[in-house]
Amino acid sequence: MTWLVIRVRANQGVERSIKDTMGHLNLTRVNHAVLIPESDTYAGMLKKSKDYVTWGEVTAEAVAELIRERGRLLGDKPVSDADVKAETEHKSIAAFAAAIASGEATVKDMPSLKRVFRMHPPRGAKGWGGIKRAFTIGGALGNRGSAITDLAHRML
């Protein structure tokens, strides 16, 4: 499985160790997103930065849409099926996304693909729904489970 992690809150007043942890996750700005494999190491990092990020398990379709819409190559060029085929053993963005979602591949397997996806703030009337509260009580922070796909779709 793979987690999609999105930064919700800014750096103002953040403890140094948490700021460093988010730096290790490549989440340096608000509305940036990364795809990380599900592991104990990353789970600890997410637990530490839970008051500043939101995350959840992502599907292959959502990963494919994310790479198509917001994925960028070095030089800020959009990603195409030809680029994926040339740099990986996968034939298309959909196949590469399925491998990422299942945990067989990572974003690092395509060297020219930037690891950070620059997202738009959430569209719609609700927006974030409160950036100071946990998702479980109506806010935006912490683990969302599969609901991360809806948020990612609103941010594309």
For the regions a protein language model found, what residue spans apply to each?
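Core subunits and conserved enzymes of cellular information-processing
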Residues: 1-156
